[in-house]
């Protein structure tokens, strides 16, 4: 038996060695392609003899290829031509830390969809470290986009990119910074560490995931100075070929910083303060956590714009939301022709002095058709309107308010609106809303809110609740 065991062990060891050699051989076959503004598409595409155009590199970049793009401005579109595989993905990236710009300045303005980077029905791809900028339209029937992913594209990573100055100048136009439209099924979508800024979007959004997208991460992005929604997760717009799964689901929106997002002055919206920093419009099973949203119209919103449709199983936790113009967090439809929000969880968020324009959205806005939601352990500090909770609809049922902290300030009143009735007495609001006994009206004792340090002091009376 010992002899047979030794033979078996030797055979196993040999097999492992062969496997390692084969893996190393495969790895060595992975290809690198180089592109430079002084290159030549008739060359070999090597480090010393780079291609000139992104188009040539895309045509040659098959599974297992990394395309290194050298410093410079490329006045062309990058259209990905091939898919990678799980073991041999394709990457387009800036060479080292080179400043690589893909510019739309010289593009002709035509109707239809136009984008500077396009991925359609492709898989296992990464776009990394590129600047995508200056694409403009004046046409109502055109949509301009920095990065556009569509079809059944999956296993896509967009990371460390910068998207600037994508603009529609039409009164009823559309533009996106980063757009993913799942007409077919998409999965494993990763939007990480990008900057998306200085956009004019018309009716559209800065970063949008729309349609049949199952599984995603939107993390550590900076989204700022745009005239419509910052991050949007959409369902029920007719995007998916399969209407049963026409909604974004099963994902995380985490540690993003979003600010100066406002539709005010956008020709599509006029003088409305209606753009959310982060918006779930009909998505399901989505966690929104540890984001910071400020100086926007609405901090975070979850609902559906379509009647009898819902944002469902949305978990909004540990976000810091301050100085927004209309409200901090909003759930439910903005009128009775919309859908609503159900089976969702809003917990341990800081909502600090929102409603700065006095529009009476308060810190927490509860709108049409909300049911079976849990709102707990949040800390709310009223803004100029003094409204903590604004609930101007009676279509509010089976929602639980537990252990929330309302910031009591000396010499300042508090206002709560519940099912259209206004309360200035916390005890009366508490009774009307059936808030639990541990809900409190007290100073939470932030460390330094003037410097946006919303940590609680060691002896805060609500520290155990907030944690």
Language model region names:
Residues 89, 95-99, 123-134, 154-167, ...:
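Right-handed parallel beta-helix
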Residues 37-75, 109, 429, 460-464:
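Acidic Gly/Asp/Thr-rich repetitive segments characteristic of extracellular carbohydrate-active
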Residues 41, 65, 111, 343, ...:
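Acidic, glycine- and Ser/Thr-rich low-complexity intrinsically disordered tracts
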């Amino acid at each position: 038996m010992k002899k047979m065991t030794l033979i078996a062990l030797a055979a196993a060891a040999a097999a492992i060695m062969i496997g390692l050699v084969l893996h190393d051989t495969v790895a060595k076959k992975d290809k690198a392609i180089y592109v430079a503004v002084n290159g030549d598409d008739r060359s070999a595409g090597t480090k010393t003899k780079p291609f000139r155009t992104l188009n040539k590199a895309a045509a040659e970049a098959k599974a297992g290829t990394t395309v290194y793009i050298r410093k410079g401005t490329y006045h062309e579109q990058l259209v990905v031509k091939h898919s990678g595989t799980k073991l041999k993905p394709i990457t387009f990236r800036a060479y080292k830390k080179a400043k690589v710009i893909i510019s739309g300045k010289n593009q002709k303005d035509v109707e239809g969809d136009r984008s500077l980077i396009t991925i359609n029905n492709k898989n296992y791809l990464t776009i990394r470290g590129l600047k995508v900028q200056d694409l403009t339209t004046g046409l109502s029937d055109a949509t301009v986009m920095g990065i556009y992913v569509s079809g059944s594209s999956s296993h896509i990573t967009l990371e460390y990119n910068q998207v600037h100055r994508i603009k529609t100048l039409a009164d009823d136009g559309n533009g996106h910074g980063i757009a993913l439209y799942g007409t077919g099924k998409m999965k494993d979508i990763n939007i990480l560490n990008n900057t998306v800024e200085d956009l004019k979007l018309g009716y559209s959004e800065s970063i949008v995931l729309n349609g049949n997208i199952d599984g995603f991460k939107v993390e550590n992005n900076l989204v700022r100075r745009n005239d419509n929604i910052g991050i949007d997760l959409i369902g029920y717009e007719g995007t998916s070929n399969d209407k049963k799964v026409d909604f974004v689901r099963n994902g995380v929106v985490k540690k993003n910083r979003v600010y100066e997002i406002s539709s005010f002055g956008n020709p599509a919206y006029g003088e409305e303060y209606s753009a959310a920093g982060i918006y779930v419009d009909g998505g399901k099973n989505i966690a929104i956590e540890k984001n910071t949203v400020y100086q926007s119209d609405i901090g975070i919103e979850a609902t559906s714009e379509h009647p009898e449709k819902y944002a469902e199983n949305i978990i909004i936790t540990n976000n810091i939301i301050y100085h927004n113009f209309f409200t901090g967090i909003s759930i439910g439809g903005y009128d009775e022709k919309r859908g609503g929000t159900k089976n969702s969880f809003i917990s341990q968020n800081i909502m600090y002095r929102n409603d700065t324009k006095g529009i009476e959205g308060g810190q927490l806005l509860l709108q049409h058709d909300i049911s079976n939601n849990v709102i707990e352990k949040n800390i709310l500090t009223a803004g100029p309107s003094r409204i903590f909770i604004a609930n101007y609809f009676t279509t509010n049922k089976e929602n639980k308010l537990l252990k929330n902290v309302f910031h009591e300030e000396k010499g300042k009143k508090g206002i709560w609106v519940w099912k259209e009735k206004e309360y200035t007495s916390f005890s009366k609001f508490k009774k009307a809303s059936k808030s639990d006994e541990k809900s409190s009206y007290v100073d939470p004792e932030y460390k330094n809110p003037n410097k946006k340090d919303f940590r609680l002091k060691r002896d805060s009376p609500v520290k155990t609740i907030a944690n």
